[in-house]
C-alpha cells in the first residue's frame, strides 16, 4: 500500500506541474503579431541562388557587350585593327574637307607667313645664322649613328644622368612656355616642333 500511495502522489504532483507549465506557456504563445515582420526581406532559398548564379553566368557568356568580354584577346585585337583601318580613310576625308572649308590651313606657308618671317629675321639682333650638327641630325641631313650617345650628353641609364636630363627638360619646358609664338598659338608651335623633328 505504501508504494501505491507514493506513485499516486508522484503522478498527482506531475499532473499539477504540467498544468501549471501549460498555463505559463499559453500566454507566451498568444503574443500580438510582430509589427516589424513585414520589414524583413524574404530570404532566398539555395535553389533560387543557384538559378540566379547560373542565369548570370549564361547571360555573361552569351551576351558579348561593348567591352568585348568573352572573346579571345587575339580576336579583340583583330577587331580593333579592322576598326582602325576603317577609320583611317574617314579621317583623311575629314582633313580634306576641313582644308577645303578653310578651317585648317594647308601645311605649306602662305605668302603672308613668309613675309612676316622675313621681316622678323631682319628686325632680329642676330647677325649670322650657323646651322649646327645637332640641327642637321634633326632635319635628317647629318648621318645618324644608332645606339651611339654623344660624349657630353648625360646618360639616362644612371641616376645622375637621369637627374641631369630631368633638369634640362624642365628648363626647356619653361623656355617653351615663355616663348611668344607658343603663347600666341600653341598648336602651330607644336606642329612646327614636330615638323622639325621629322
Swiss-Prot record:
Q: State where it is primarily located.
A: nucleus
Q: Which UniProt keywords apply?
A: Nucleus, Ribosome biogenesis, rRNA processing
GO BP terms: namely: maturation of SSU-rRNA from tricistronic rRNA transcript (SSU-rRNA, 5.8S rRNA, LSU-rRNA)
Region entry Disordered: which residue ranges?
28-49, 137-163
Q: Which Pfam families match?
A: SLX9
Instruction: State the source organism's domain of life.
Output: Eukaryota
Assigned GO CC terms: 90S preribosome; nucleolus; preribosome, small subunit precursor
Q: Where in the cell is it found?
A: Nucleus, Nucleolus
Known function: Involved in ribosome biogenesis. Required for normal pre-rRNA processing in internal transcribed spacer 1 (ITS1). May be involved in the movements of the replication forks.
Family, as annotated: Belongs to the SLX9 family.
Assembly notes: Interacts with the 35S, 23S and 20S pre-rRNAs and with the U3 snoRNA.
Spell out the protein name for this chain. Ribosome biogenesis protein SLX9
**What organism does this protein naturally occur in?**
Kluyveromyces lactis (strain ATCC 8585 / CBS 2359 / DSM 70799 / NBRC 1267 / NRRL Y-1140 / WM37) (Yeast)
Organism lineage string? Eukaryota, Fungi, Dikarya, Ascomycota, Saccharomycotina
UniProt lists the gene as SLX9
